């Protein structure tokens, strides 16, 4: 079974996990880097995206929004042009505000792959500090995964995609991290509100 087949079977077993306004889908483009570019006419903000295997998210940009259609405005004046840097294969999906990301590997990845995915998690968490990044390996987990996957919130082993108990554990794990992400976001928001309240006194 290919990695994409495992992913598609998994999403079929997870699709009822959350309800609106949250979504759970595959191959969701998630921002990992923002680049500001000054120009003579208007400044530009480039939003670069990674496509993630399975994501619990809210919509940031609808999939119908094209690469250069978004802007930051003040009244009727455009202040910044927004450029969505995503490949054409990502245009069939909404661009997401991630709460839980589940990255899937069919076999135990090598050290270089683990480091790459861990760095990817770090970049995403820099923009979305509340986001939970889970790393799922279909099969056993080697010790090097724990040594090098320092930015993963949890490393999961799935050995049989048709085992109801394993799927239940996975569902419970995703919901646990979804709750953690929402609580973290609340904490971040409360701190901002409290800070603003202090500055008004």
List where the protein language model places each region.
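Conserved catalytic-core segments centered on acid/base and nucleophilic motifs
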Residues: 102, 124-125
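Conserved catalytic cores of phosphodiester-cleaving nucleases, focusing on short active-site segments
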Residues: 54, 98-106
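Short, solvent-exposed amphipathic alpha-helical segments in soluble enzyme
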Residues: 118-121, 151
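Short, well-structured alpha-helical interface segments that form or flank functional binding sites
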Residues: 5, 49, 97, 109-119, ...
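Active-site metal-binding core of divalent-cation-utilizing nuclease and nuclease-like domains
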Residues: 25-94
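C-terminal tail/extension regions appended to the core domain(s) of diverse proteins
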Residues: 1-46, 126-201
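N-terminal targeting/trafficking signals and adjacent low-complexity tails
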Residues: 4, 8-11, 61, 66, ...
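Active-site-adjacent loop/helix micro-motif of nuclease/hydrolase catalytic cores
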Residues: 64-68, 107-118, 144
């Amino acid at each position: 079974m290919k990695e994409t087949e495992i992913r598609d079977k998994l999403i079929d077993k997870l699709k009822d996990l959350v309800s609106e306004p949250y979504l759970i889908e595959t191959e969701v483009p998630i921002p990992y880097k923002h680049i500001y570019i000054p120009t003579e006419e208007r400044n530009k903000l480039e939003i670069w995206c990674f496509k993630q295997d399975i994501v619990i998210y809210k919509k940031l940009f609808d999939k119908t929004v094209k690469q250069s259609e978004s802007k930051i405005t003040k009244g009727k004046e455009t202040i910044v042009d927004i450029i969505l840097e995503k490949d054409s294969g990502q245009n069939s999906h909404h661009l997401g505000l991630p709460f839980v990301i589940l990255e899937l590997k069919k076999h135990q990845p090598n050290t270089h792959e683990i480091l790459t995915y861990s760095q990817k998690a770090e970049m995403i968490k820099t923009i979305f500090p509340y986001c939970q990044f889970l790393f799922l390996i279909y099969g056993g987990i080697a010790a090097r995964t724990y040594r090098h996957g320092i930015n993963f919130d949890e490393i999961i082993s799935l050995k049989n995609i048709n085992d109801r108990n394993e799927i239940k554990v996975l569902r419970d794990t995703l919901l646990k991290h979804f709750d953690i992400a929402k609580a973290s976001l609340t904490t971040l928001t409360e701190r901002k509100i409290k800070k603003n309240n202090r500055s008004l006194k």
